Every structure is written in C-alpha cells, then in structure tokens.
C-alpha cells in the first residue's frame, strides 16, 4: 500500500511539473554550483565535466518554452532542434567517451573541424546562445513581471542572438515579433494550476541561479577552443 501511494504521489508530482520546474531539475543534475573559468586544455579535461544528456534535456525544455512564445521564435526553435540532434548523434556514436561535452569540443579541435558548418562545436555554441537568450529573458521577467513582452523579447534577441545571425534570420524574427503573447498570457502558460505569479517568479529566480554558472562555464570552454565568436555560416 505504501509503495502504491508513493507511486501515485510521484505521478501527481510529474503531472504538476512545469517547464520551469523541469528545467530546474535538469540543471540540478549538472551540479554546477560555482563558476570555473579554464584557460588551458589540461584544466578543461581535468576540471570541467559538462554531462551532455542533462544539458540536451534542458535545451529541449527551452524549445517547449519557446513554443509558448509562439511563431516569433520559430527560427531559433528550429536551430535548437537541429543542434540537439547533431550532438545526440555524436553521443550515440560512443556514449562513454562523449558523455562529457568537453570531449566533443576537444576531438573536433584536434581534428581541425570545429569551424565547419555542421560541427558539433557550432551546435554547442548555438545552444549556448539560445541559453543566453533564455537567461536574459528570465532576468527581465523576474525584475518586472508586468513589462511588455514584445519589447523584452526583441531586446533580449538583439543582445544575445542577432549579432551572430544572418540577415534572413533576423528579418524573419522581426516580422514574427508582432505575434508575441502579452506578459500575462505567457506567465500563465508557464505556471502550474493554482500557481501564483509570485510562485512563478520564485521558480524563475531559482532557475537563474543555476543557469548563470552553467553559462559562464560553457563560454569559458567555447573560448578555450576558439569557437565562441563564430557567426552563422
């Protein structure tokens, strides 16, 4: 009976889990409590462990959040999907070796393939930029839950993605920007049933605290392997 009750409680918990809650859960698995900046490959190999599967699971959650923003984020969403698939394919080729993202970046740097259009290094870079956008948007939301969503999304895009996007992608984003939902609609679809805006705000704050050190570490690794400034091919 006790086991059955525990199973029912777990099922209920899963049903109540929001995208924000799922994101917190995935980032908690990564266990990056503080920022570690590396400057040499030896440090990257010996100190940094970036488990690939939880990282990709988190990126899949970003896709779900972007879906709630609507067609405006279609270009970014498509890019994220493709980049996740590229890294998953590499992982599937040797799950033991490529369970750590650093090993993938190291392999391509050694082969001289990091800068190729379909490299896994580029995939990791663009996923990092998608996370940069997500962090910027969450920080704006937690600061002011009543702000204009269209303006917030445009400013976050201009800051994190636009400098690296080609003009076609930037133009497509600009056209779709008018389809952004208002802030109340967006917050409500992020919330669980009976969850207040304050509760959502608290969850977002928790997520931000996990995302900041992860992104600092990712940028450090990307800079080390000299792929951090690559633009769209």
Swiss-Prot record:
Keyword Cytoplasm: no
Superkingdom of origin: Eukaryota
GO molecular function, one term: lipid transfer activity
Record's keyword annotation contains Transport: yes
Keywords from the named record: Lipid transport, Transport
Any matching Pfam family: GLTP
Gene Ontology cellular component terms for the protein in this record: cytoplasm
Binding-site residues for a ganglioside GM3 (d18:1(4E)), renumbered to this chain: 79, 83, 126, 165
Entries under InterPro entries matching the protein: GLTP_sf, Glycolipid_transfer_prot_dom
Biological role: May be involved in glycolipids transfer.
Protein family according to the UniProt entry: Belongs to the GLTP family.
PANTHER family from the UniProt entry: GLYCOLIPID TRANSFER PROTEIN 3, GLYCOLIPID TRANSFER PROTEIN-RELATED
The protein's name: Glycolipid transfer protein 3
Originating species: Arabidopsis thaliana
